Amino acid sequence: MLVIFLGILGLLANQVSSQLVGQLHPTENPSENELEYWCTYMECCQFCWDCQDGLCVNKLGNTTILENEYVHPCIVSRWLNKCMYDLGQGIDHVMVCSQPKYWNPYKILKKEWKENNSQN
């Protein structure tokens, strides 16, 4: 019985350590160690991309897209296990931080870049 209890306790401790913890005041620039979390569930946020000369490279996966309305300024925050993306103009997404859900209202605007694409 004690072995089962300790096993369950160990699983819970492991789960908690892999989740984002604490409060994050609203920011357009989450820390480098949180980018993977925030950019996985809404990749259109501007802080997920390095844009130069009309092209944007994803900071996590090296995907390259044409710079357009797909890349948006986002404000992210975390409070009491609620994670929030605010895209402005009343567009926001709130989720339970420990049970995140992908959301991307701008996915139709994403234009992947290939070497033979023109930017016209």
Swiss-Prot record:
Record's signal peptide: 1-28
InterPro entries: ASFV_fam_110 (IPR004848)
Glycosylation sites: N62, N116
Pfam families attached to this UniProt entry: v110
Coiled-coil ranges per UniProt: none
Keywords: Early protein, Glycoprotein, Signal
Family: Belongs to the asfivirus MGF 110 family.
Function: Plays a role in virus cell tropism, and may be required for efficient virus replication in macrophages.
Name recorded for this polypeptide: Protein MGF 110-5L
Natural source organism: African swine fever virus (isolate Tick/Malawi/Lil 20-1/1983) (ASFV)
